[in-house]
């Protein structure tokens, strides 16, 4: 995996917390469990309807009807508050991200250039708290 450093190293590292969100039924447990296995040295947190904290954008979250848009709001609020690494729940963990990724303030996945050139992806995000 090629990476390009755009930030200098900072004293605070991205916390070793994996965040995933699932709103609704039919949670893909096998896929989500792959993160618990691969990232066994990280805290693992699943956010769902039973444990959503009070949000700064609570009104927007409650008005939104689409689950994917609610998850977008929730992911940014959770990452801002706690920091860590967010992965969409429809992904399977095959291998850990390199530890040096935790030495940045923020990083995000980049979409495949062949299929969607120039698109930053929000399915995988890492950041320190209070950065977004």
Please provide the spans of the model-predicted regions:
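Active-site-proximal specificity loops/subdomain of glycosyltransferases
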Residues: 45-73
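Substrate-binding rim/cap in mid-to-C-terminal beta-strand-loop elements of soluble/periplasmic
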Residues: 119-132
């Amino acid at each position: 995996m090629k990476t390009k450093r755009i930030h200098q190293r900072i004293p605070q590292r991205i916390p070793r917390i994996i965040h995933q969100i699932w709103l609704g039924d039919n949670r893909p447990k096998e896929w989500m469990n792959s993160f618990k296995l691969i990232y066994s040295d990280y805290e693992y947190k699943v956010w769902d309807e039973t444990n959503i904290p009070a949000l700064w954008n609570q009104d927007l979250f409650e008005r939104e009807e689409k689950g994917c848009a609610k998850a977008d709001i929730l992911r940014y609020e959770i990452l801002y508050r706690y920091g860590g690494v967010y992965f969409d729940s429809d992904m399977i963990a095959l291998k850990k991200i390199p530890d040096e990724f935790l030495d940045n303030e923020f990083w995000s996945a980049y979409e495949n250039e062949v299929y969607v050139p120039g698109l930053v992806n929000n399915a995988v995000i890492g950041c320190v708290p209070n950065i977004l």
